[in-house]
A protein has these predicted regions:
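A short, structured loop/turn motif at beta-sheet edges
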Residues: 10-11, 70-77, 95-104
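Beta-strand elements of well-folded, non-transmembrane domains
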Residues: 7-9, 55-59, 71, 86, ...
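Short, surface-exposed coil-to-beta transition loops
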Residues: 1-2, 62-66, 89-92
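Beta-strand/loop substructures that line and gate deep hydrophobic ligand-binding cavities in soluble
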Residues: 82-133
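Hydrophobic ligand-binding cavity/cleft-lining segments
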Residues: 1-46
Length: 149
């Protein structure tokens, strides 16, 4: 899944927001009951940072999720990968390009569900739509934060 969004802001302000794991809750739908559980979490992300949280993505079933910031170049990109959670694979690239009058933010998400054919069926029936809804919510929140002056 790939998503692009133009933000009418400078790279410093966009980066300050997206590189703080404490802002994840602000761009996650309330019904997901997102709670960061990492003790003493740093203000800003860094390569090797582990972020643990509880989230209820489907049927209000709470689950633990742990991601690691595996790669990062300030004002350019960062990558988070699931270390524990509902996916067999979760690799999320966040790319930032300075453009005239703003920043183009691109999300590239590669993921795979466990359980073979059952996982594929579950994806078709529930997961794909849920992920699209989450990223639509994030798009709208980022739009309100950076594009409505």
């Amino acid at each position: 899944m790939t998503r692009e969004q133009f933000l009418e802001s400078n790279i410093s302000d966009v980066w300050a927001f997206v590189s703080s794991p404490h802002n994840l809750k602000k761009i996650t739908p309330n019904e997901m009951n997102f709670i960061i559980t990492s003790p003493n979490l740093a203000k800003n992300m860094y390569p090797g940072m582990i972020i643990s949280y509880k989230v209820s993505p489907i049927f209000k079933i709470p689950m633990n999720w742990v991601t690691e910031i595996t790669h990062m170049q300030k004002h350019k990109y960062f990558v988070d990968e699931q270390r524990l959670g509902p996916y067999s694979i979760w690799h999320h690239q966040h790319i930032f390009e300075i453009k005239e009058n703003g920043v183009l933010m691109t999300d590239i998400i590669s993921y795979k569900l466990p359980f073979g054919i059952i996982g594929k069926l579950f994806h078709k029936l529930f997961i794909k739509k849920k992920l699209e809804g989450i990223f639509n919510y994030r798009f709208n929140k980022m739009n309100k934060l950076f594009n409505q002056k």
